[in-house]
């Protein structure tokens, strides 16, 4: 299967923004790539969702419910949100759904929720999904204080499961005067053995930010 698994060191680090940029760049280059986000939570009626943005990034190449089969109201890990709603997330159905997309398209970019060890089902985490799909992993991390530890832990967890690290992207998702930001890329490279591919500065306007992300990531990540 051709594609990529996008995880984060935490929630709110910009996984969806990065995934949208990668999908849009791939499609602009002539590659039929689609995103897939198995589950999203914290969905409010009438409000735009991560799945909506991913759907737009691939020009509506697949129905929204195919690109994101599970949506939950509570802003919790999918397994917990499903439990509160009396529902179950089917790991097998998700794996089958990704493989079906891979059969119809040239590449599938699968976006997790939160971090690598977030419970997707009552038994499986997102790390288990990456293993089942055989996809290499892109880690999106915060740019600021604490990211060295969070990134190192994520890289250690994926390597322990035999997963291949494609790249680390440091994303400054909000404005900050954090003094650690200039030093974190080199320190992450030292402790993980992998230099972060890019440090993405904060851009307030959403449309302009997506253009910026696309330009910074263009041609840098292969899948």
UniProtKB/Swiss-Prot annotation:
Positions with a binding annotation for substrate: 41
Matches recorded under Gene3D superfamilies: P-loop containing nucleotide triphosphate hydrolases (3.40.50.300)
One biological process term in Gene Ontology: biotin biosynthetic process
Pathway in which this enzyme or protein is active: Cofactor biosynthesis; biotin biosynthesis; biotin from 7,8-diaminononanoate: step 1/2
Major localization class: cytoplasm
Amino acids binding Mg(2+): 16, 50, 111
Catalytic activity from the UniProt record: (7R,8S)-7,8-diammoniononanoate + CO2 + ATP = (4R,5S)-dethiobiotin + ADP + phosphate + 3 H(+)
Keywords: ATP-binding, Biotin biosynthesis, Cytoplasm, Ligase, Magnesium, Metal-binding, Nucleotide-binding
GO terms for MF: ATP binding; dethiobiotin synthase activity; magnesium ion binding
Residues binding ATP: 50, 111-114, 171-172, 201-203, 208
Keyword set includes Chaperone: no
Keyword Phosphoprotein: no
Any Gene Ontology CC annotation: cytosol
Pfam families hit by this protein: AAA_26
EC number(s) reported in the record: 6.3.3.3
Cofactor(s) it depends on: Mg(2+)
Superkingdom of origin: Bacteria
Assigned protein family: Belongs to the dethiobiotin synthetase family.
PANTHER family: DETHIOBIOTIN SYNTHETASE
Summary of subunit composition and partner proteins: Homodimer.
NCBIfam families documented for this protein: bioD
Functional description taken from the UniProt entry: Catalyzes a mechanistically unusual reaction, the ATP-dependent insertion of CO2 between the N7 and N8 nitrogen atoms of 7,8-diaminopelargonic acid (DAPA, also called 7,8-diammoniononanoate) to form a ureido ring.
Protein name per UniProt: ATP-dependent dethiobiotin synthetase BioD
Species annotation: Anaeromyxobacter sp. (strain Fw109-5)
Gene it is expressed from: bioD
């Amino acid at each position: 299967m051709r594609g990529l698994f996008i995880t984060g060191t935490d929630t709110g680090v910009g996984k969806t923004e990065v995934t949208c940029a990668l999908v849009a760049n791939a499609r602009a280059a002539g590659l039929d790539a689609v995103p897939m986000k198995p589950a999203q939570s914290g969905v409010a009626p009438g409000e735009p969702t991560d799945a909506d943005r991913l759907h737009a990034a691939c020009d509506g190449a697949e129905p929204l419910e195919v690109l994101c089969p599970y949506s939950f109201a509570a802003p919790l890990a999918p397994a917990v949100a499903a439990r509160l709603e009396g529902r179950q997330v089917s790991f097998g159905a998700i794996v089958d759904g990704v493989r079906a997309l891979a059969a119809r398209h040239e590449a599938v970019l699968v976006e997790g929720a939160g971090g690598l060890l977030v419970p997707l089902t009552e038994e499986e985490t997102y790390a288990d999904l990456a293993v089942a799909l055989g996809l290499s992993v892109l880690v999106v991390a915060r740019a600021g204080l604490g990211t060295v530890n969070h990134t190192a832990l994520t890289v250690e967890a994926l390597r322990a499961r035999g997963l291949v690290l494609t790249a680390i992207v440091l994303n400054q998702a909000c404005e900050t005067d954090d003094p650690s930001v200039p030093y974190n890329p080199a320190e992450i490279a030292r402790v993980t053995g992998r230099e972060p591919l890019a440090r993405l500065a904060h851009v307030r306007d959403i449309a302009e930010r997506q253009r910026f992300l696309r330009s910074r990531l263009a041609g840098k990540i292969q899948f």
